[in-house]
């Protein structure tokens, strides 16, 4: 009898709690005016096409950018009220180098970290002093204090235990080392005593251009890369691969340990490609439905046309083949940021199909669906099949400018916890200046071109 009465009382309590929670949620929603569907955050520098970043947690959206006066800036948008707070990091963009991308991340304590505005120049890094407060971001500080004089390609990621990681290149194109740092509450520490990739090979300078450290379904981090001999893009050679459980001990696909730093001689070669063969450093890595790594890259075919190739690990052997049959040849030469004529995302599995988002002059922007066995293109679909984009108000680009779209990603929260999706948009001049100051004598738009930075919100259907 007591058990039955206890069960009844428990059921009543649970019902009351559920009703209270529902009422509280409705009350919170009622108090939460929310954001405008198109919220102007700031005026930004648009004379160079450089990558900004944006993320959200449960309370705020953070956007990093270069403001109209070229200062590295961070905006904090309150998701409940739409209020925008901004701060400047003590670092000013030169205005032309598209390498000077910006990256953001939240640590386990929900403090924001930002890095950017560097190309073979001193490391620029700042972080919040406390969660949810912009204070602290204005001051540039060192991470480790060593190998931070010539930094490029900042990249935040997560270790297997959720701790924040940071990767960057120290040195120059064709002569650079790759380091990994790890953040604990006490601060940053160098994760490996030696760099991941070597800056020299057989007394010649080299530099690895690598993918992100991608967590695979097998519990390993996977990475693919190309080597470059010097500043010129045509000196890229060889597609390579390695994996690691902890980002300290690295292996080839057979499980053999590769000592650090990895060199062209010790690396596992996936596809041996000589210089001047159309191999660019926009290499990508994904996985098929069986969890096998698939590397996407460009190179010339036997006729000299540029094709999208895939390399897949099958029964311990890398099988490589062209996925496309294009007639177009893309053969960029020299140094500096190159305007992308062929872009691709790397593969992913969606609804049991292996797909990849690709843009190329002959076909435009498409989502390519691959045959699982041959890896050939089976179908070409709309680009929205890859990832449906939030509705964005159409705004005509100023003459000579191009649109930029940055998806706001989730951090320290799951996608299902949000009823909205967000993107950030702005206009910039195209990446056609090879990181050099522009000649403005007869320009269609001024060289000090600026644009509104707009946060677009799309409420998801229930």
Pin down the residues of each PLM region.
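Bacterial N-terminal signal peptides
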Residues: 9-19
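Extracellular, repeat-based ectodomains that mediate carbohydrate processing or recognition
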Residues: 26-462
